[in-house]
From Swiss-Prot:
Sequence similarity: Belongs to the ZIP transporter (TC 2.A.5) family.
Annotated Polar residues bias: 40-56
Effect recorded for Y646A: 2-fold reduction zinc transport activity in yeast assay
UniProt organism field: Drosophila melanogaster (Fruit fly)
Signal sequence range: 1-21
Cytoplasmic side: 283-292, 351-604, 653-665
Record GO cellular component, one term: basolateral plasma membrane
Transmembrane segments: 262-282, 293-313, 330-350, 605-625, 632-652, 666-686
Compartments reported by the entry: Cell membrane
Protein name per Swiss-Prot or TrEMBL: Zinc transporter foi
UniProt keywords, alphabetically: Cell membrane, Developmental protein, Differentiation, Glycoprotein, Ion transport, Membrane, Neurogenesis, Phosphoprotein, Signal, Transmembrane, Transmembrane helix, Transport, Zinc, Zinc transport
Phenotype for H554A: Severely reduced zinc transport activity in yeast assay
Amino acid sequence: MARHIMAVCVVCLLCAHRLHCQDHIESLLGPARVTTHNSQDQLNARVYTNLSPSSETTDRRQQRSASGDDDTFNYSISPPSRREKRHAGHEHGPTSESRVPQITQYYLEKLMAQDELMNSSGFDGLLQQLSLHSLASGASEGTCVPGSRLVHHVQPHDHHHAHHHEEEDHSLQLNNCTLIQNGTTSNVICPSLPNNNTHPLGKEAKNFTLSDKDLLHLCPILLYELKAQSGGCIEPAILSDIDTTEELLEAEKDKDIFYVWIYAFISVFACGILGLVGVAIIPFMGSRYYKYIIQYLVALAVGTMTGDALLHLLPHSLAGQDERGMIMKGLGCLGGIIFFYVMEHALTMISEWRKSVEKKETKKPSRAKVMRDPDSSVNNSVAGDKICKQKYSSYPYCYDEITMNNKQSEWMHLPFDVAAGAGGDAPSVAELRNGVGDHDGSNDMAAAAESLISPLHTNCVEMNHHNHNHKHNSHQQNHEGQDSNTIVTDLDGNAVYAVNKAKDKDSRNDHVTVILREHESSHHGHSHRHGHVHSPPETLSAVAWMIIMGDGLHNFTDGMAIGAAFAENIAGGFSTSLAVFCHELPHELGDFAILIKAGMSVKSAVYYNLLTGVLSFIGMIFGIAFGQSQDVAQWMFAVAAGLFIYIALVDMMPEISASHKSLGQFLLQILGMLSGVGIMLLIALYEGDLMSAFGTAGAASHQHAH
């Protein structure tokens, strides 16, 4: 309704400024005579109907254009500078270019005299022509509000600073203005303000400029003054009441900021505390239901993160944008996706560089253990069983043997007696190279042995040295005569070792663990299998460093998204917090599992998870601080939407797409994704009601805009 009033207001304002409305209607309708009973219908028809340029002759149009009185929609002569927008309805107010009707924009351009801004002298001239002399600067002599103060209230300003200078003058004003009517004229007489020959807001406030949006804001005020026939005299007490209302709204905003910090802190704390959940689920990791629960949680995270990105973050980032602004916000979303891709791969490259440096500084081991990974894609491809292999983890594989402290020293003891080992029952290195073995997989083991022994293949295996102190001295003495260069494997439960005649007492306890992993890809009815060597993490410090960097990056961006969402409105903040919570649950479980399987204690794993959670609070502070600006908040929403889309579709979607062997698993994953999308959809649809429930100051304006 307000939009239509503004459209008519601009037309009437132009009519009063240029010529009488009756003459204007006659000029629009050409030679047709306008009668009293149908003038209103013809005016409405002209306002809401675009007449064809052929309704007037070419000579008449050119004559009117030359005289400067061309008030028709003669786009064939001077087309409007603004073209129609393909998108509308993205602004939370009636002043957006995408919501301004074409007729309003056309007359605004004529009022602005083809300039983008109207200066103070031009506005005073407009007030004089409208017979609103009391609003003209210097004409009120302190009895009425001057036009400069009126402009100050419709333009963005520091309310607290202005109110500090005005409240003393307002306190001297009495609410006993009288209306004096003399025939057809009316004047309002109010008590005079102290005349100090100085504008209450300063001399600089007398010189101002008006944009087309400012003029739209002033139109209802000017139209009301024309209707009241008061000569444009606005009581100062009215502005005093308006200032009081604005002050109350500012106080409500300050109160909302307090709750924004509280809710954001609670949300980030709830997401960060999920690192402790890993301690509680340790007894249930071996349960048959664990992998199904993880699959549902990962699918739920995919639904919530994509839903929050597409149903909440992106719509808010595009609100009130013109076509160019929408394109730039979409570019920001793409930038978030590319940024996260570059950062993840940069961390991987740095990790590989660190391991290569450590490998060069470490001597080659004298013993090596070669084993087949029981969790390789050939043996097991269920995502629930590979939860520690998700892309969030610092290392993509689990190393069970590292944590088997009770078996770390046993694998070095040869399963055969000394005579058997010395007598040649065990295959030699040469036999392994030739592919001789008594079990399947010896060729793979031989290749690994070759890579360990040959200096040309030292870059194929990364070394992990362990120094073991054996408690049984007699047992060590029995094996003291064994060869110091031994390769052992547990492929399919069998043990294979290679003997070298060189003996080195000092290096007999140095060894390296090598993991053989077979990968299989199936498509079009056939499959391909290949195997290569993986190594466990070099040191626990490398694992901890990668966890802090990778997980810390996720937590910082999550905290920033939560802070910016709460700064925009509390309901949207809870929507983003729920999406982050659903994403963090399987994420933290995966990080906790990789730390435990890398040999860390439970206490250390919890410490590292909580340490990375601190970055969430830092991101939250950045989000709330910069989210106070609407423009900055929209950019943050666009980038956060890109980050959420990348995490959901690149990091988490492969975890569930790789495990849909059974119909039950497929239905469970679909249920999780639909649940996440449904939750985000409900929050997006009823966001205004949620804002009202939390009592935010912007709830009323938000609901009014929609």
